Amino acid sequence: MAHLITLATCSLNQWALDWEGNLERIRTSILKAKEAGATLRTGPELEISGYGCLDHFLESDVYDHAMDMLFKILTDTSLHGILIDVGLPIMHRGCRFNSRAIILDGKLICLRPKLYLANDGNFRENRFFTPWHRPRHVEMHNLPPQLQEHQGVRQVPIGDVILSLNDTTLAAETCEELFTPQAPHINMGLNGVEIFTNSSGSHHSLRKLNERIALIQEATRKNGGIYLYANQSGCDGDRLLYDGCSMIMVNGEIVAQGSQFSLEDVEVVTATVDLEEVRAHRCAPSRAFQAMQAPAYDRIEVDFRLTHETTSIMEIPTPTRPPRYHLPEEEIVLRRSKMAGYLVPLSGGIDSCATATIVYSMCRLVVQAVKDGNKEVIADVKRIAAFSDKLPDTPEEFCNQIFHTIYMGMANQSSKETRQRAQDLAKRIGSYHTDLNIDDTYHATKNLLTQGTGFEPKFKVHGGSNTENLALQNIQSRSRMVIAYYYAQMLPMVRQRPGGGSLLVLGSSNVDECLRGYLTKYDCSSADINPIGSISKSDLKRFIAWASKNLDMPILEDFIHAILDMGMTYDELSRFGTLRKQHNLGPYGMFLRLLNEWGGHGKLSPREIADKVKRFHHYHFINRHKQTVATPAYHAESYSPDDHRFDLRPFLYPPAFASWSFKKIDERVEALEKAMKRGQTIR
């Protein structure tokens, strides 16, 4: 008896509420899986509706439309002959569920709702869905009339179920379930499940892929099994970027791994695997003893085999391969826009340089995809790069058509170095660059106060107060935002772009500066989207250093050393951010932790550490209001202060230096200093 089977998983660039577009991508993935000889296909979480519908999941239309799309899949005879695992939202007994639908030859076999919902970080699934808090429970689901007529039955099973096929056994788990301590695959494997499917909507953040791969390896390394992981790719309408990287593992070893970042709308990953490898892996007596004690699952018998019925097909198992990881500096990318292009205000500093380099990196990916014949990308390029009927041959040529940079300086205050760095970078990447002085705008705005009140503000060096000095600086900063949007609206017309259009304004404030509030409200940090708003300065420096060598851009070396000082280092800011968000430490707890990390002989004193901790929290508290209007940032760092839904905090805080936490820090510092004077060690 043959034990070789070909399986398929996929990454789909789905879009929330793009019903027909999502359906077409699902259909394409199934057809590609069939062409590759696969007999099982699994896809991303909620792929029919798109994962990022957010509060639209509270609308009844979403569930009706999802059933409409499911009906189209069931009635498409070209999709027969393969077992299909597809994700959609469903309504059952008045409750909303995030569910999988298992389909074979136009018939809905069962529905498998998600057991454990993601409800931390960026996720709020409990807001939309009900968890299936009945492990191993199965009941009947009433189908809508349209599906009843097609199925010939009124109900189908719904629940935590195992499918028993003619030659193997399989079961599904969904995204977050893999991350739980007692994941469903543990008892499923002990119940004889040999194939696990996992449909995910897992967004990218730096270094997150390493965690995913480790969890999937662990899922099958001890208990054996074949694991199919599917994930969404691209942006589906929110600030999250889904990074694909679908994969297939056998007994903890990767046999197939898709791209982590791809411009493909549909990427199908297939592998041929040997069921006997799983069975041989499970021969240990200790596993058998636990299997006999494991709680039993209901099984649905499916008259279908995944192995090929003919011996004329020559197959060999797909060999194992090592995992493929991107360096953090390689993971920083930009994806999807429906406007006429981009505009970035270049300051000559590393942040706007990083944003520009990310766009240039995107242009390299796009041009390579064009050369590879990617039809979807070619269609997008023809629409966006409208200045020429000819497809771009180089990234610089494409960059010049879609990317606009602008340096907005002051005649006497802007340095020649920053102006030259901006100009050199624009020339290297090929952007359409504008260099101008904004003195007239600055003086016109400054004089409005004098005209209205008779008061003439002065910079501090000319005898003015701190208030005057800050107000005059902010005129420059905020004028740049207005001018950037003005240019973004008018440049396509100035350049006589066919079809006109306007540009997407990109911001350039990094996560560390957002955390401290080291930015001006409504300056150039205010934009349509901020590609680096959740990336640390340390990672940006590494990215620029990497791009300097790997993208042949030595000009970038000049930017690495052009970094401002905020009274604390960026490495310190990164550590503050990590302890605050990931370790859930307040001011006092953070101080105690840093005593061990930064204190000791020859290192920082307790008072120096206390001053740094208090200074950070003081600025974080007084500037928190800036995050309420921060430009939407692509989520990349797990300590992001994104106020939208990732980091929910007040924006009005009582004075930090009068807080109880700071008083406790002071008490501890005094106790430590007294002990050190006595030559004692305080633990």
Please place each PLM-identified region on the residue numbering.
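Enzyme catalytic cores with a strong preference for nitrogen-chemistry domains
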Residues: 1-345, 356-383, 682-683
